[in-house]
A protein has these predicted regions:
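Retroelement reverse transcriptase polymerase core
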Residues: 1-193
Length: 193
């Protein structure tokens, strides 16, 4: 992407209900410190995708910036190898991180490239937004570093999923406690439940 002319696209048209939702979600992102007002020459449009539960997911259309981004070739594990590791395990827990990607900070020099435009203003992300081509690789790399010594022993990472597996209930309770403690130490937070 070095030397690329900044890419900026006009906002997409939105229905009145989407505009109301957009205003609320932008305010929520501002309140959480995930975004800030921007003067960046970059700017991607926004759209909403309806989730299974009927709520609206705010999506930034980063397709144009993704076309000029140098792809991180982080190796994804083979599914069959991951499944082989589960042999003999009888207890499993999947950990979801609360706003997973949003727990990763964007390097200050890259923040302007995350900019998005709306009728309510121009903003940029301070945390990793969904939709950037390298977001899954960056997140998986972080999780692999957090759990490096326990990978393939009782932790499997696949993109943004953390799977804890154990042979016995007692082992599993210990492994789960350890995994949650490790996340806490790294200031990463799991969803309750």
């Amino acid at each position: 992407m070095p030397g690329t002319t900044p890419i900026s696209k006009a906002p997409y048209r939105m229905a009145p209900a989407e505009l109301k939702e957009l205003k609320e979600q932008i305010q929520d992102l501002l309140d959480k410190g995930f975004i800030r007002p921007s003067f960046s020459p970059w700017g991607a449009p926004i759209l909403f995708v309806k989730k299974k539960d009927g709520t609206m997911r705010l999506c930034i259309d980063y397709r144009e910036i993704n076309k000029v981004t140098i792809k991180n070739k982080y190796p994804l594990p083979r599914i069959d190898e991951l499944l082989d590791q589960l042999q003999g395990a009888g207890f499993f827990s999947k950990i979801d991180l609360r706003s997973g990607y949003h727990q990763l900070r964007v390097r200050e020099e890259d923040v302007p490239k995350t900019a998005f435009r709306s009728r309510y203003g121009h903003y940029e992300f301070l945390v990793m937004p969904f939709g950037l081509t390298n977001a899954p690789a960056a997140f998986m790399d972080l999780m692999n570093r957090v759990f490096s010594e326990y990978l393939d022993k009782f932790v499997i990472i696949f993109i943004d999923d953390i799977l804890i597996f154990s042979g016995t209930k007692e082992e599993h309770e210990h492994h789960l406690r350890f995994a949650l403690q490790r996340l806490r130490e790294k200031s990463l937070f799991a969803l309750d439940g």
